């Protein structure tokens, strides 16, 4: 039974709490009444009596119970009559509490809710003090703050009254702890009277009135400490750099500092002009950690900036006595002030100040020591790094190659192009090779010309040679070319061996027209020799033709076919021979009946004969005749007609 009762109490408490959180306990549909003496809001520490009266139907309650913040009260409950009960609190000190009462009806397993109340205790407001109104630079608002005094614990409102001393117009602004008033709403006057009224359920208090001139309450833009450094001079000093975006020219500032282990601040005062860089010098203890803060105000005014954020700096580890003589510079306007005790207008605690020298820099003073140290450091660094990079370049071949490639890409090509060396020329190496390089490029065929025949000798038929000698030579030559012996016979014609890579080319012939191309020596009569002499007299110069590398090896030797010996000796002719030969040159191109028609000379070698003259260990290219065979035959027939 006790367990069930506890669950019922928890449910009722949760229900009351839920209802109180959503609109207050007074929104409960009460089955009776509940009131507080002296009231629902009362001064903290007073004695309080809370009454509960039931008005339930069909219920004669056995007991009435009180709950505070969900917990059942057991003491100081008095049953006044059958329907009313009271609970008494001595020196109630809780700021907020919610109370409800229940009734125990016969025949019900749970208590019945009667009613509930939300009660509060607090203090009447104190008169606002230290009323201050300022205009932060660039904000566009007048900000008024004050000291509210001790907490009231109950809802307290603060009303700011702003009254113009020129127009007598008064404006009121509702606030809690501070207020921001737009300067646009204060255009009617420059002088105002400001005070604050604090009001709550327990009382009302007014602050002292404040006379305000809008031009005198402007605070410069916030100051910020950017960095600090300790120099390594003979007497080490710490330079603190700070800045502000204020447009006010005349500003008075304070900078306070202390070690992190000390509770006493040392304050340094100086005039500042934020048109220039702000630097403050301090002679501090070595190897110590210091905290710096700065604040400023317009010169001659009473309102200060709030202290800037703490800036921590660690001094160097150098030790030694320091001379407290201030450092002077032609670029610096220096002021010193001795203050035994500082009582800031916005601060209530006295602060100890030491005798310090304030140094304000105008511009950027040049530091000769810093420049010398930087130059010396740079020279030492360069002297060390140059040998290191040189050694790396010497021993790292890939790095050298990479650097060389990048340099060659950046400089003009003509600066590093080598003069061709003929000893290492690819052309010279190609001529020295014994292998044949085929060239199928038809565009290069037109560049080949016939070489000059420097000498043509004819063996007289009167000279008798042994038959064995002729047959042996001819047989050996033909057998080496893998050609049938019966296919060749002696001839008195000039034999041209074409370049196998380029096909046929027009050549000169001395064969009598209409005669047999291959005439046996035994069948030739002496009369034919005379005509032959005349025919050879016409051949003084010969067209130039060019041989490939493979053909040169073959043509550098003397080729003797029967009585005719064609000797090709390169380099044995001179300019005089060429000139004489040009004067005596007779064209081998035969003239037709029409003087304007020119018939070119043709090759007299058949395809079978040319194939026999090729080198045996080479792959023969396709024989590309310059003229079809039927064209050659037609030319041969026409030549025969001309001779007749």
From Swiss-Prot:
Domain of life: Eukaryota
PROSITE patterns: FN3
UniProt-recorded Gene Ontology molecular function terms: interleukin-12 receptor binding; interleukin-23 binding; interleukin-23 receptor activity
Tissue distribution: Expressed by Th1, Th2 and dendritic cells.
GO cellular component terms attached to this protein's record: cell surface; interleukin-23 receptor complex; plasma membrane; receptor complex
Parts of the chain on the Cytoplasmic side: 396-644
Gene Ontology biological-process annotations: cell surface receptor signaling pathway via JAK-STAT; cytokine-mediated signaling pathway; inflammatory response; leukocyte mediated immunity; negative regulation of interleukin-10 production; positive regulation of defense response to virus by host; positive regulation of interleukin-12 production; positive regulation of T-helper 1 type immune response
Record's subunit section: Heterodimer with IL12RB1. In presence of IL23, the heterodimer forms the IL23 receptor. Interacts with JAK2 and in presence of IL23 with STAT3.
Protein name, entry field: Interleukin-23 receptor
Organism (species): Mus musculus
The encoding gene: Il23r
């Amino acid at each position: 039974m006790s367990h069930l009762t506890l669950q019922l109490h928890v449910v009722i408490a949760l229900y009351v709490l839920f209802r109180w959180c959503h609109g207050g306990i007074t929104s409960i549909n009460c089955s009776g009444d509940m009131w507080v003496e002296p009231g629902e809001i009362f001064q903290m520490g007073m004695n309080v009596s809370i009454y509960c009266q039931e008005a339930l139907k069909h219920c004669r309650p056995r007991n009435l119970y009180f709950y505070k913040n969900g917990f059942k009260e057991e003491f100081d409950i008095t049953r006044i009559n059958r329907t009313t009960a009271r609970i008494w609190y001595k020196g109630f000190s809780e700021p907020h509490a919610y109370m409800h009462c229940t009734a125990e009806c016969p025949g019900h397993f749970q208590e019945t809710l009667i009613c509930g109340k939300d009660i509060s205790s607090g203090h009447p407001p104190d008169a606002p003090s230290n009323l201050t109104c300022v205009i932060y630079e660039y904000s566009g608002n007048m900000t008024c703050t004050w000291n509210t005094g001790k907490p009231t614990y109950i809802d307290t409102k603060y009303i700011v009254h702003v009254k113009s001393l020129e127009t007598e117009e008064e404006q009121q602004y509702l606030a809690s702890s501070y207020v921001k008033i737009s300067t646009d709403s204060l255009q009617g006057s420059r002088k105002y009277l400001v005070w604050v009224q604090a009001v709550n359920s327990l009382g009302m208090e007014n602050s002292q009135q404040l006379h305000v001139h809008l031009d005198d309450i402007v605070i410069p833009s916030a100051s910020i400490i950017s960095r600090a450094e300790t120099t390594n001079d003979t007497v080490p000093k710490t330079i603190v750099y700070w800045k502000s975006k204020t447009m006010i020219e005349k500003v008075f500032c304070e900078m306070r500092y202390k070690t992190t282990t000390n509770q006493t601040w040392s304050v340094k005062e100086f005039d500042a002009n934020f048109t220039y860089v702000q630097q403050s010098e301090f002679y501090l203890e070595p190897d110590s950690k210091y905290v710096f803060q700065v604040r400023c105000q317009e010169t001659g005014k009473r309102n200060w900036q709030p202290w800037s954020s703490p800036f921590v700096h660690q001094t160097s580890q150098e030790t030694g006595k320091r001379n407290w003589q201030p450092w002077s510079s032609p670029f610096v306007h220096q002021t010193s002030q001795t203050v035994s005790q500082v009582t800031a207008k916005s601060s209530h605690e006295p602060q100890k100040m030491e005798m310090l020298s304030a140094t304000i820099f105008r511009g950027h003073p040049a530091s000769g020591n810093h420049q010398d140290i930087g130059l010396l450091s740079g020279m030492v660094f360069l002297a060390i790094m140059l040998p290191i990079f040189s050694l790396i370049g010497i021993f790292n071949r890939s790095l050298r190659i990479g650097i060389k490639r990048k340099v060659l890409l950046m400089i003009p090509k003509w600066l590093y192009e080598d003069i061709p060396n003929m000893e290492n020329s690819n052309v010279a190496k190609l001529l020295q090779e014994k292998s044949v390089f085929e060239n199928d490029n038809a565009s290069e065929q037109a560049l080949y010309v016939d070489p000059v025949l420097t000498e043509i000798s004819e063996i007289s038929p009167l000279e008798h040679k042994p038959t064995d000698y002729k047959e042996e030579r001819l047989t050996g030559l033909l057998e080496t070319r893998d050609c049938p012996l019966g296919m060749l016979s002696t001839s008195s014609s000039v034999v041209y061996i074409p370049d196998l890579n380029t096909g046929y080319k027009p050549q000169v012939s001395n064969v009598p027209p209409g005669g047999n191309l291959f005439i046996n020596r035994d069948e030739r009569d002496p009369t034919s020799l005379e005509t032959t002499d005349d025919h050879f007299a016409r051949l003084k110069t010969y067209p130039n033709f060019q041989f490939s590398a493979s053909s040169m090896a073959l043509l550098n030797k003397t080729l003797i076919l029967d009585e005719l010996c064609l000797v090709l000796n390169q380099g044995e002719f001179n300019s005089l021979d060429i000139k004489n030969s040009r004067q005596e040159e007779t064209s081998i191109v035969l003239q037709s009946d029409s003087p304007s028609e020119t018939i070119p000379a043709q090759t007299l070698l058949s395809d079978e004969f040319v194939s026999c003259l090729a080198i045996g260990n080479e792959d023969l290219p396709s024989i590309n005749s310059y003229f079809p065979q039927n064209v050659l035959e037609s030319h041969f027939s026409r030549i025969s007609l001309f001779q007749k």
